[in-house]
From Swiss-Prot:
Keyword set, alphabetical order: ATP-binding, Cytoplasm, Kinase, Nucleotide-binding, Phosphoprotein, Serine/threonine-protein kinase, Transferase
Organism: Arabidopsis thaliana (Mouse-ear cress)
The reaction(s) this protein catalyses: L-seryl-[protein] + ATP = O-phospho-L-seryl-[protein] + ADP + H(+); L-threonyl-[protein] + ATP = O-phospho-L-threonyl-[protein] + ADP + H(+)
Assembly, per entry: Interacts with ARAC5 and ARAC10.
Active site: D267
Region spans: Disordered: 1-67
A GO molecular-function annotation: protein serine kinase activity
Name of the protein in question: Receptor-like cytosolic serine/threonine-protein kinase RBK2
Native organism taxonomy: Eukaryota, Viridiplantae, Streptophyta, Embryophyta, Tracheophyta
Gene: RBK2
Source domain of life: Eukaryota
Length: 460
């Protein structure tokens, strides 16, 4: 595939997404269409559009644009979101010496989005709440640093409590240019509004006053990371760890195979797994998530984003992102559940590199978290260790799919591919596999790559 055909393929995919009301772009395009109709009818001497024309713009979507002033403001959001989509075209590496497309960036985005009302634009579902900035400030004690429970590339996450006693997590976009913040907000909003599964975080509303905020339901337990590596670690019995592993795997199967379009999360880690009151895991933070069209085997990205310790080799070597990127990160998460160790310790020691020799020797007693003592199910421990070993394989081709991971965790070890599946997988031997096969990859190079990425991240 040359760069021109890749470019054309992405343009075709964009057009298809515009026609699909169940995709983020389809929903946003429908809203923008209605906004344009409303704007044109209010500023023209021509007769207003008939009811049928307006209904067509709303057909098969939950999007509604009711207020002209709000529509005008959100129109700026949509244009920035669309521009960001076009920027992704440049992620295809040019071949045959072709020059990459030049995308001009508008640096004059209007950052003043105060007073915009969510329900004037969207009516995703009846339970979606439109929070005011005062609601959010009261809930988080004016964004007190003590209430920070997570940090990301563009945002901080605060825990809060509403007047009725409901706990919430507030993701507040604080970093980047106004354009970048807007793009990140719309990208994540476009995904989470279409995600609904017991093992994904419950999105309950937004606040677009005084900045951009996404609000999620939170339980007193907080995140897996805070329990696993914090003072409340004793609460995580083996049975709970095993159920967290299985529930998180179910959530990833939903994202990869159960959604209308494949979703690659790209930032699976202990801090991004919320736990409900009964210790059920919920995947959260879709800020880095990508929709992967069915025509494509992978995305190529030029900007490294995510969390050190969870990067798959093909990602930080070649910028390749697909379902197996999440599988690798899930393997690291399994190791955290087994060992109680973080993905990177205080000395920057990689959990993967520490655990691999023990996995190869099947030294499970040396792997298991000492705080558990002998209070674990040996059969389940063997399942988790063997599955983790497969998930963190250097070769993305040799890693299982998440649906296979679930079967392995359940003890269905006779997971085999049909001849057709095997043939498809042989045909899909890409790019990530061929590039990894072309170099000898070892622990020293792994650490060297991590160091280089760390230097780039700190310098940017």
């Amino acid at each position: 595939m040359n760069s021109a055909s890749a470019h054309d393929l992405r343009l075709l995919e964009v057009d298809k997404e515009k026609q699909d009301p169940k995709s983020p772009r389809g929903a946003l395009e429908a809203c923008l269409t209605r906004c344009s109709i409303s704007s044109a009818s209010s500023s023209s001497d021509d007769p207003p559009p008939n009811r049928e024309a307006i209904d067509n713009a709303d057909a098969d979507t939950d999007v509604q644009c009711k207020n002209h002033r709000a529509s005008s403001n959100w129109g700026k959001f949509f244009k920035l979101w669309k521009r960001r989509s076009m920027k992704r075209l440049s992620s295809f590496p040019p071949l045959s010496g072709a020059a990459p497309p030049i995308i001009k960036q508008n640096k004059s985005a209007d950052p003043n989005m105060n007073g915009m009302v969510l329900h004037d634009i969207y009516d995703f579902q009846s339970s979606l709440q439109n929070f005011s900035i005062s609601d959010i400030e009261i809930a988080t004690d004016n964004f007190s640093p003590e209430n920070i429970i997570g940090r990301g590339g563009y945002a901080d996450v605060y825990q809060g409590i509403l007047p009725e006693g409901k706990l919430i997590a507030v993701k507040r976009l604080t970093k980047g240019t106004p354009d970048e913040q807007t793009a990140e907000f719309l990208s994540e909003l476009g995904i989470i509004a279409h995600v609904d599964h017991p093992n994904t975080a419950k999105f309950i509303g937004c606040c677009i006053e005084g900045g951009m905020h996404l609000v999620f339901r939170l339980s007193p337990l907080g995140s897996l990371g805070s329990l696993l590596h914090g003072p409340s670690k004793y609460k995580l019995t083996w049975s709970r760890r095993y159920n967290v592993a299985l529930g998180t795997a179910d959530g990833l199967v939903y994202l990869h195979e159960g959604c209308q379009r494949r979703i690659i999360h790209r930032d699976i880690k202990a801090d991004n797994i919320l736990l409900t009151e009964d210790f059920q895991p919920q995947i959260c933070d879709f800020g880095l998530a990508k929709w992967l069209p069915k025509q494509l085997t992978h995305h190529n990205v030029s900007k490294f984003e995510g969390t050190f310790g969870y990067f798959a080799p093909e990602y930080f070597m070649h910028g390749i992102v697909d379902e197996k990127t999440d599988v690798f990160a899930f393997g690291v998460l399994l190791l955290e559940l087994i060992t109680g160790h973080p993905a990177l310790d205080e000395s920057q020691q990689s959990l993967v590199l520490w655990a691999k020799p023990l996995l190869e020797r099947k030294a499970i007693k040396e792997l298991v978290d000492p705080s558990l003592g002998d209070e674990y199910n040996r059969e389940e421990l063997i399942r988790l260790t063997s599955t983790a070993s497969l998930c963190i394989d250097q070769s993305s081709l040799l890693r299982p799919r998440m649906s296979q991971v679930v079967e392995l965790l359940l003890g269905h070890e006779d997971v085999v591919m049909t001849p057709r599946e095997a043939k498809i997988k042989m045909m899909q031997r890409t790019y990530s596999e061929e590039l990894l096969d072309s170099v000898e990859y070892n622990s020293t190079k792994y650490l060297g790559d991590l160091d280089r990425i760390r230097e780039v991240a700190l310098a940017s």
